UniProtKB/Swiss-Prot annotation:
May be involved in transcriptional regulation. InterPro entries: KRAB, KRAB_dom_sf, Krueppel_C2H2_ZnFinger, Znf_C2H2_sf, Znf_C2H2_type. The keyword Cytoplasm does not apply. One of its GO terms (molecular function) is zinc ion binding. Coiled coil: none annotated. SUPFAM superfamilies: beta-beta-alpha zinc fingers, KRAB domain (Kruppel-associated box). A zinc finger (C2H2-type) spans 148-170, 176-198, 204-226, 232-254, 260-282, 288-310, 316-338, 344-366, 372-394, 400-422, 456-478, 484-506, 512-534, 540-562, 568-590, 599-621. This is Zinc finger protein 189. There is a cross-link at K67, K88, K160, K434, K452 (Glycyl lysine isopeptide (Lys-Gly) (interchain with G-Cter in SUMO2)). Residues 14-89 form the KRAB domain. GO terms for biological process: regulation of transcription by RNA polymerase II. Gene3D superfamilies: 6.10.140.140, Classic Zinc Finger (3.30.160.60).
Amino acid sequence: MASPSPPPESKGLLTFEDVAVFFTQEEWDYLDPAQRSLYKDVMMENYGNLVSLDVLNRDKDEEPTVKQEIEEIEEEVEPQGVIVTRIKSEIDQDPMGRETFELVGRLDKQRGIFLWEIPRESLTQEQRMFRENTNIIRKRPNSEEKCHKCEECGKGFVRKAHFIQHQRVHTGEKPFQCNECGKSFSRSSFVIEHQRIHTGERPYECNYCGKTFSVSSTLIRHQRIHTGERPYQCNQCKQSFSQRRSLVKHQRIHTGEKPHKCSDCGKAFSWKSHLIEHQRTHTGEKPYHCTKCKKSFSRNSLLVEHQRIHTGERPHKCGECGKAFRLSTYLIQHQKIHTGEKPFLCIECGKSFSRSSFLIEHQRIHTGERPYQCKECGKSFSQLCNLTRHQRIHTGDKPHKCEECGKAFSRSSGLIQHQRIHTREKTYPYNETKESFDPNCSLVIQQEVYPKEKSYKCDECGKTFSVSAHLVQHQRIHTGEKPYLCTVCGKSFSRSSFLIEHQRIHTGERPYLCRQCGKSFSQLCNLIRHQGVHTGNKPHKCDECGKAFSRNSGLIQHQRIHTGEKPYKCEKCDKSFSQQRSLVNHQKIHAEVKTQETHECDACGEAFNCRISLIQHQKLHTAWMQ
């Protein structure tokens, strides 16, 4: 009886090799026993699925007995270093109907080829018998052949199983579900990796540092930290990376691509992580919490930097002097001391600085900006450190303590000056890079810090100063320089403090408030004078008649009654006056057309439209004469 001819091969039927996974010798050695067991189970499951779905390329009349007939995968290491992995399924006892499926993973260790590609004369007798008696043996598909092509995106695949997996990207199919949380995945391997979240299993351990991972690919990437391997190189700049995704992100620098867009403000980012961090500015989310002080941060990097305050860690060390810093930015700024680099240039005066913060503070000299205001008294400052020092006046805080006698000071300069009592040091150095003269500061306080010594001399008039900044300001009297310009009216000033006071004319700002009556002033000196009304203090006394005044200007004007001095002279009629306001009122006579009779004071020359106003005015002269 003739043997029945094999049925024609149906279109779309699979061989077991279509869904088989092949390992190289190196990959197989890397797997632990549990992983090899998993591999065996998956291969058996795949074969069982093919048989149960009736898509296997075999006789339809044959009934598989998968459970009993699939033998264990045997792992035999041949003398030639070849892995032997078999799966056998005996269909029935009929020799013509018997079909043995064997997943042959025999790889030559040196050349990486399959068993059937080795010349027959090079095989052992056992290997020749195995190859010749195997009914279905197919070569591993050529890595260049990609016969399975995706109609959606055109991507090609060598294996049909990979092609099927890829199609789920387009269809969104996720047939593999987690029993714990119900989350579904497109691949069974993804489920296995995901389930380790629930079990806490981390089977992949680093041989270098002992760190464990739940996914093998994460371990491979991690080990590149130890080996220094960077297999992914940029074609544009030749920079290499340890991870492919890092290369993809890097290439956006060259292409300018920013695919991640913020839905709130429209700002785009090249990296998704940057978008996530940016979105926290809208949501206010701060998911990273410090376990020491409960402070929270929007970025993990900020938390890491903050935690060094508690640990005292200073990982960034200067190669020149050995000084260590908590942040890399601090180290970069410090290194400019050694290099002398000053990349930040002021466009107004050309002065350069090593830090951008120094430039910003300097530019406030030109703009007159004083953004730091004291909530207690309203005084404002151009630098935060100056405000901090000033606030100690209100709080009474004296953080600088003398180790010799225990006396405390609110400023470090006060402590330094005091310590010279103990050391008998008689010199008074001044660090101009740390502190600068503030016109609003008490001159008495500054003279206590820098007593007597005035080493800065003006070449024009010989006047000396204890601080170089004071000399620079003084020299503008001789040069006429007025570098501080009002942007509103164009008026210029020799000092930034003068500009600030002037700008309050435009803004109407009156930051100095009297606590007694609530009256406010644009200048601190006016507030001090006003407060004399409440205190009744009149420190300025006339030596001639004993009359006292709350202001020095009032005393000077009064003394002209005794001396007869009239320094204010009218250019029209040569008449002179003891007070400037009297001259101003007098000049109105020349400037305005007389439409009515005016009444002029014989004592000072001030004119009035009403006679009663003149009489009231003359009472001032008679009161002063008493």
